[in-house]
């Protein structure tokens, strides 16, 4: 429904039709249970379209919009009012606009468009484009892979492109130029940090954001689409980027922030907050569940669900994305309530995906930073959740060093059994680093101590789920970041020169090799793990040689599964987190031989056991196919 609203351009007629929808809780009570009326007297539109030759706004003469009842064609129900106006034909170009809203008993407000497709250059204006190139997103080459087959690269568009951007190039164009390097690394999916428009200051030097303070859910940020050499190509750059990803077999996952909105001052905050005379009456905003952040969206009300659902469907259908990461879903989820919030939203999205023949679409949660997120993933029908204990425990073992050196502890066994408790068809997103926390290499002590990270890299790519790395991790970026405060969300441009020198070259090769091994062996993507259910008071290997030897900083585990051709693959993984070479012995079920995949050395058992020496801060992946 909401995809029909906004500033929609008829490229043949060169006109734009503005449509602003306001639900009516009195005449359409199904739209919301909590909230009041907007108390709007009338709505006008102002913008650079008023004087297209000079792109001047005429605030003294706002263009009055016509109000009429809106009946949803999907169900024939009255939903509220729509305010509309169609312009005369306009010259090609990029135009900006806002709604001028007068209330019954409050000062008028200039408010941005909640359904605009473009963010503006300043003051959180909305935008539209007349003319320019037309692009249709090309589908993914081949077929969309099951989630566990993905190797994900988390990409922050600004930091990724800042130091390699050409003068007359939009940041989204720069990403396209770097895609082949990511393919060489071995990933097959990119999770883009939010590209939707956020609230920003007028000072161009202060409009940096990670994107987790959204205001317009249908809109791509002007910062990412701006090419100084042309004004008519904007959204086309995002479409081309997704097409170029798809041409290379790269899945595109959108990071969606649907828990909250930024209610900055009226002229630039979340429109559906400020479209109400008393913003407290907005049915779109309210504390639905725990974890209030900015202004929480109120999923107790149908209008909120429909707005966010339709925004998701817009990105799915029009931009052909392959998955959505749902940021901070704590505020969208009430345990036991399947009729509202996250369960209802995902149910309606799954229904749409089924109707449109859209298989293997990823629905990924960021929920609790503990194992309780697994049960929520199962309960709401998501594909995956970010399994943050994988990061937090790895960070702790690497960096805390109570005795002066990295020390693993028995809870690592539950961490490595990352696929545990997920329903069939669901799996974790595993990582040792992401945008939200300090760099893993920094925790190691900096790039000089890169070798300390090696057993964790081996673990990540031999665990169940879809492994994720954060941009720059592949060559050992080690910039610091506080966990909170003003120095947290600031630019941290990637230094691509680090990829051309040591230790960046070696670190890159470690990640590339482990990704290659994972792609070549489907059984590593299964959930099978031994020893499962490890007693976390036990710091000794079991009688078969598996588990953790805390005193020697050694871990041994077994993974297995089908190779995709009906053959059994077995993997025996040994991780040495210590500063000395360690001798390890563990049982295997046959006479071998076994290939150690990191070195390609062939070893054979003796008396039913493999006896191996593993170098310090290193590991072994012993493989045999039946």
Mark where each language-model region is:
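Non-catalytic, glycine-rich low-complexity segments
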Residues: 1-38, 141-142
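Active-site-proximal helices and loops of the catalytic beta/alpha 8
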Residues: 40, 212-213, 248, 317, ...
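N-terminal carbohydrate-binding accessory modules
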Residues: 23-25, 121-154, 167, 198-205
């Amino acid at each position: 429904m909401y995809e029909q609203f906004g500033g929609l351009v008829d490229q043949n007629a060169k006109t734009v039709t503005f449509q602003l929808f306001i639900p009516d809780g009195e005449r359409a009570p199904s739209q919301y249970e909590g909230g009041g009326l907007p108390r709007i007297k009338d709505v006008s539109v102002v913008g650079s379209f008023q004087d297209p030759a000079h792109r001047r706004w005429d605030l003294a003469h706002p263009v009055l919009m016509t109000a009429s009842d809106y009946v949803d064609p999907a169900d024939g129900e009255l939903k509220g009012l729509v305010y509309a106006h169609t312009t005369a034909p306009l010259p090609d170009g990029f135009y900006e606009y806002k709604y001028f809203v007068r209330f019954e008993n409050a000062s008028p407000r200039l408010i941005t468009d909640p359904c605009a497709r473009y963010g503006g250059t300043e003051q959180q204006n909305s935008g539209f484009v007349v003319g320019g190139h037309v692009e249709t997103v090309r589908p993914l080459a081949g077929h969309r892979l099951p989630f566990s087959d993905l190797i994900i690269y988390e990409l922050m568009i600004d930091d990724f492109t800042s130091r390699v951007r050409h003068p007359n190039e939009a940041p989204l164009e720069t990403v396209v130029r770097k895609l082949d390097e990511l393919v060489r690394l071995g990933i097959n999916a990119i999770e883009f940090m939010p590209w939707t428009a956020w609230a920003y200051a007028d000072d161009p030097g202060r409009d940096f954001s990670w994107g987790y303070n959204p205001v317009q859910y249908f809109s791509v940020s002007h910062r990412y689409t701006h090419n100084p050499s042309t004004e008519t190509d904007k959204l086309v750059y995002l479409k081309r980027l997704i097409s170029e990803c798809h041409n290379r077999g790269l899945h595109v996952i959108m990071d969606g922030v649907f828990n909250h909105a930024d209610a900055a001052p009226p002229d630039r905050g979340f429109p559906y907050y400020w479209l109400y005379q008393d913003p407290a009456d907005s049915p779109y905003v309210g504390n639905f569940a725990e974890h209030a952040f900015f202004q929480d969206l109120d999923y107790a009300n149908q209008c909120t669900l429909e707005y966010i659902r339709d925004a998701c469907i817009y990105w799915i259908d029009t931009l052909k994305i392959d998955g959505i990461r749902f940021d901070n879903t704590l505020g969208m989820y009430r345990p036991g309530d399947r009729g509202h919030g996250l369960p209802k939203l995902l149910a309606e999205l799954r229904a749409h995906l089924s109707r449109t023949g859209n298989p293997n679409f990823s629905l990924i949660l960021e929920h609790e930073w503990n194992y309780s997120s697994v049960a929520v993933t199962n309960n709401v029908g998501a594909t995956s959740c970010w399994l943050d204990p994988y990061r937090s425990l790895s960070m702790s073992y690497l960096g805390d060093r109570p005795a002066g050196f990295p020390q693993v502890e028995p809870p690592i066994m539950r961490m490595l059994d990352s696929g545990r408790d997920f329903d069939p068809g669901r799996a974790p997103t595993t990582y040792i680093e992401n945008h939200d926390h300090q760099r893993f290499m920094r925790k190691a002590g900096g790039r000089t101590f890169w070798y300390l990270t090696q057993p964790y890299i081996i673990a990540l790519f031999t665990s169940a789920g879809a492994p994720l790395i954060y941009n720059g991790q592949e060559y050992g970026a080690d910039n610091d970041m506080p966990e909170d405060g003003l120095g947290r969300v600031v630019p941290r441009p990637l230094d691509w020169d680090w990829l051309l020198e040591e230790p960046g070259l070696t670190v890159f090769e470690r990640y590339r090799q482990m990704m290659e091994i994972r792609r070549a062996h489907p059984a590593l993507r299964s959930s099978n793990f031994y020893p499962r259910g490890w007693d976390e008071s036990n710091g000794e290997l079991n009688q078969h040689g598996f588990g953790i030897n805390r005193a020697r900083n050694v871990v041994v585990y077994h993974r297995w599964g089908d190779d995709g051709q009906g053959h059994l693959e077995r993997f025996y993984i040994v991780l040495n987190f210590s500063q000395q070479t360690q001798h390890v012995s563990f049982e295997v079920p046959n006479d071998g031989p076994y290939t150690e995949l990191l070195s390609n050395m062939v070893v054979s058992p003796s008396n039913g056991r493999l006896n191996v020496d593993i170098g310090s801060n290193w590991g072994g992946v012993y493989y045999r196919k039946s």
